[in-house]
Amino acid sequence: MTTRAASANLANARMMHNMEEAGHMANLKGRPHTSHASQRNTLGDIGNQVSAITISDVPRKDPIIKKEIVHLSSHQHKILTKSKATTSLKSLAEESHIPKKQEAFTFLEPVAAMPKPTTVPTATVLPQPTVPVPMDISENVPESFSRVLLNVQNIDANDKENPQLVSEYVNDIYDYMRDLEGKYPIRHNYLENQEITGKMRAILIDWLCQVHHRFHLLQETLYLTVAIIDRLLQESPVPRNKLQLVGVTSMLIASKYEEMYAPEVADFVYITDNAYTKKEILEMEQHILKKLNFSFGRPLCLHFLRRDSKAGQVDANKHTLAKYLMELTITEYDMVQYLPSKIAAAALCLSMKLLDSTHWTETLTHYSSYCEKDLVSTMQKLASLVIKAENSKLTAVHTKYSSSKFMKISKLAALKSPLVKELAAASV
């Protein structure tokens, strides 16, 4: 009996539980949603400002609440709907008497986003870049005030198109060459108290002129050879039996310095009739290089004559006659102390006077840095050398310029004119 009674009580309890559960579900379905409607109207003012809602409005106590991740695409707004978790949240809130402020809520359908204003892109006006003003490189450059006063012509005005003539800084080059003249001077009477005399020097250089002519070397090579000999003899005395060795070795060094194809050492051994060996020439070359400190940049007369001839606008006859007058000086021991620039200017000035009595212009004075008064004593010395060359035993230079290659300039009748005799007589 007790068993039956217990079974009956258990059946009644189950029935009562089912009835209560059914009634509870019916109440949930029939309940009006007025309170939620009012909340939705209030939340409806928010629009689709989803970012204004924070997580702090959702109760965090109950672990039953499940977070849902809502993804909003950039092209369409998804509508947030009530989920099962929200429904269960509501029933739990009612059963546990949670205040309405903490009740879970769902979002209304978002208000359609306002269309973005269509803005017409306007063209941005960029500032125009400033064009740099090109530097004035025209040839109409005003002359310096001093040059205008002196009536000096610009002899390099037509050379700007030829880069080899370096018209932009050719004057600076010649200023530098004049400075080098003072750096490598030749002393007057430097052979005093030496075994070598001025006459021996003249014989050596006259023979070297013949060697130079036979090897068909440049004019610069001859002048540089003489400059090396004079600089060495004034620095280091040389015995008489080594003088010819010094001469051929100096020409070897000058050929290497000036020529494109320099003669070989064997050529100089042959030209001396085997008086010196190849080894002796090479040893003397080392000696000269060390004594002169490998410096062979002393300016030559020929460099200045070319500049002066351009400034004077002289013809080939005057230029060749000036070359002949200059070359007469290389054998003259008494003129070793003269500056190459002064010898070149005096030779050209005398050449102009002998051929057509042309005067020394202001342009020549400007570019040569010598006026006519400064050249008188040098011209007198040159005139005496012209008369001396007619009867001298050292005929290499005179014979060289008597050929048709040099316009037979040494045979000109002007060299026997009264002007030459007058200038030679004034020379002391």
From Swiss-Prot:
Q: Which GO terms describe its molecular function?
A: cyclin-dependent protein serine/threonine kinase regulator activity
Spell out the SMART domains in the cross-references.
Answer: CYCLIN, Cyclin_C
Q: What is the lineage of its organism?
A: Eukaryota, Metazoa, Spiralia, Lophotrochozoa, Mollusca
Q: Which PROSITE patterns match?
A: CYCLINS
Q: What is this protein called?
A: G2/mitotic-specific cyclin-B
Keyword terms, alphabetized: Cell cycle, Cell division, Cyclin, Mitosis
Do the record's keywords include Cell division? yes
Oligomeric and partner information: Interacts with the CDC2 protein kinase to form a serine/threonine kinase holoenzyme complex also known as maturation promoting factor (MPF). The cyclin subunit imparts substrate specificity to the complex.
Record flagged with keyword Cell division: yes
Q: Which SUPFAM superfamilies match?
A: Cyclin-like (SSF47954)
For this protein, the record's PANTHER family field holds: CYCLINS
Q: Which terms under GO biological process does the entry name?
A: cell division; mitotic cell cycle phase transition
Organism of this sequence: Spisula solidissima (Atlantic surf-clam)
Q: What does this protein do?
A: Essential for the control of the cell cycle at the G2/M (mitosis) transition.
Tell me the protein family, please.
Answer: Belongs to the cyclin family. Cyclin AB subfamily.
